[in-house]
């Protein structure tokens, strides 16, 4: 008996010695070993200036040969991106949110992620069959609480490869199956063209895209339809307006696309409290290439159907992507979002001021205007600063606004793609500063042909 007690006491003492040794070494003498090469490689690529008109990346073309080449911004060329091409066509079509890149350059240390070669090799987290990071789910709930743009209490959260995959999962979950009549998908004009493109591409017997929600409401065709799915995009893409549902009734289901409902783009007027809401990292932090989004879902049956869709189509979202999203969102909420949201809002506010000044001198083109509203996040009345300018060609002869701008070497997106009139064109304002500067230069030249002086802008 005494012998056993001595063995137990000896074991406890030995464990204490080992524990103290480990803690002492970890806090006093530990130094990085295997991360050195990765850190040096990342910093070496980031240190290449590319004349301020491009970027060098760890995975850039030529790195396998030991080169760190520059990837130049549009309209710049040369080995170091120092050559500006004359009369280069401007790309105002893409929704790449590169306007936030300067913020993340400032936050290089806080936002950096280094992972081991054996990081999350399993299909699931913790061996419990879960495809989602519990910590990432926690921080998403904190983010919405900080911003005040969505209710997360009593909501399930599901991750997807951007809002694009989540949209498909949502439509699948809400569509009727084994019905003689397919569910109808509607939204308000102008609408994000992906809604129609996805419905047409998947060509499901359970779903049919019907276009404008208001037109559908007035139509006699809706009398015998058992289920309608309305997508409510707020703020709306392309015109930036806050939207509410058009349809009502027991046979209507809703998908609320809140990808742009962040203080950069819109006043936060209320906490969204919906059955199914979609968000994306792309428009939250600017990291479109990470392909990460999430849905807030009230009903468990809908959540389960969406979870099955995500599981069967991709077995969840990349674990590496989830790690990066976690680190980025930790930076965002570190100061309550104050720094990034003020930076993003300030950048877009300045861009809109320049744009409004140019178009105010034109009678040929007009911009969509939205009345300022009180923002619960910034605690003040503020203007809308949407991602895109929704431009109308006012002259009767200018029937195709997209082609009018394209002839002036500005490529936007045709209004017809949004279910609207061809007299409209969408111009992106969220790309890099170089892209915006080139857009403004071309717009000045274009508007100046109306014999109005714009050089002072």
From Swiss-Prot:
Its domain of life? Eukaryota
> What's the cofactor?
pyridoxal 5'-phosphate
- Identify its membrane topology class: Single-pass membrane protein
Chief location: membrane
| Location of the protein in the cell | Membrane
Q: Give its E.C. classification number.
A: 2.6.1.-
SUPFAM superfamilies on file? PLP-dependent transferases
Q: Which UniProt keywords apply?
A: Aminotransferase, Membrane, Pyridoxal phosphate, Transferase, Transmembrane, Transmembrane helix
Query: What GO terms are given for molecular function?
Result: carbon-sulfur lyase activity; transaminase activity
UniProt cross-references to Pfam families, sorted A to Z: Alliinase_C, EGF_alliinase
Top enzyme category: transferase
Q: Does the keyword Hydrolase apply?
A: no
Signal peptide (residue range): none
- Return the GO cellular component terms, semicolon-separated: membrane
CDD domains, A to Z: AAT_like
Q: Tell me which residues bind pyridoxal 5'-phosphate.
A: 123, 163-164, 237, 257-260, 280-283, 291
Give the N6-(pyridoxal phosphate)lysine positions (modified residues): 283
Instruction: Give me the segments passing through the membrane.
Output: 6-26
Instruction: State its role.
Output: Probable aminotransferase.
Family in the record: Belongs to the alliinase family.
Q: What is this protein called?
A: Tryptophan aminotransferase-related protein 3
Its gene name is: TAR3
